[in-house]
Amino acid sequence: RWGDMLDHTIDRLLDAVWVLALALNPAFCGQASLGWTAAWFTLLGSYMGTQAQAVTGLRNYRGFSRADRMVLTLVSLVATAALIPFDAAIFGTVDVFGGVPITAMSLMVVVSMLGGVWTFLTRFRQAAGDVRRMDAKDPLPQPGASDE
């Protein structure tokens, strides 16, 4: 149990730190506000899968997963590396969060942020349905309720 808890804890932290580190890197994005926002939503999405497992006993892997983020990150890094020799790695700037350069890596951070929101909502909805079905089939005893 301790190993499982430790594994889940470290996994959740690394999910967020990975996105944050890429967003904070000035060569890729350099935007702390975007990075923290993306890390927060990534963490929420990852957390909801673990929370569903803790409550229902069923692990929920739906949504934008770590594997999806890794593939997207790899594609973004390859695209960035291919564009740098042509001085074309920055496509422009968006005036949000104080100005965000549009690069393959900043797009990866934004997609990870939106993926985190979508994953959280998807996993929450599924877990809520699972809990409702469990409660309908086998409700937990309520304190102070009579056993009639």
Describe each PLM feature range.
Residues 2-7:
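Membrane-interface alpha-helices at helix entry/exit sites of multi-pass transporters
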Residues 8-148:
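A feature for the membrane-embedded catalytic helix bundles of lipid/isoprenoid biosynthetic enzymes
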